[in-house]
Amino acid sequence: MNLLEPSSGKISIDNLPLASIRNAWQKKISYIPQNFYILDDSFLENILFSEDKKQVEINKVNQILKFCHLDNLVDDLPEGLNTIVGPSGKLLSGGQAQRLAMARGLYQDRDILILDEATNALDKDTEDKILKNILDLKKSKTIIIISHNQKVLDLCDKVIEFKGNKANIN
């Protein structure tokens, strides 16, 4: 994930200019976007994505599969985690692909988790279960949720609404 330069002013974190700590800061963030890229590769490769393939933590992968309610799907796949999901994940439903993207972000296990409309392709029941799991993470991570879904926003401790050039904290 790249960080954009501000059009004016500067961004500081703990009184340090973001530009001077950009690489360290980026390593603290997992970003789960609304529009994600699925590799024409295995389920496992899509979870690992840019992570070190030599250091696969299979127990961690299995925990994340359960967290994202993908464990039963993977168990039913002909080659399990080694099943090729097809170009752009065409062998997966929209909700399954979105949960795979979520598993990728969670595998990175970073301090800050940003979810950008990350549950919009999920059915209500699956969304409720995954949101519960995500909220359990707030004990150990900073979670930033970007959503237009009021039900999702109602689960947040703080809501910042952007309208025009103003940010309102509710």
Please state what every model-predicted region is.
Residues 10-12, 44-87, 131-132, 140:
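ABC ATPase nucleotide-binding domain helical subdomain, centered on the C-loop/LSGGQ "ABC signature"
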Residues 1-2:
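Helix-to-loop junction immediately C-terminal to a conserved catalytic motif
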Residues 93-94, 100-105:
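ABC ATPase nucleotide-binding domain "signature" region
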Residues 113-117:
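Catalytic Walker B motif of ABC-type/P-loop ATPase nucleotide-binding domains
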Residues 155-170:
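H-loop (His-switch) and adjacent beta-strand-loop-beta switch element
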Residues 127-139, 151:
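Helical segment within the ABC ATPase nucleotide-binding domain
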Residues 107-111, 140:
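A short, proline-enriched helix->beta-strand linker immediately N-terminal to the Walker B motif
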Residues 9-27:
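Conserved ABC transporter NBD signature motif
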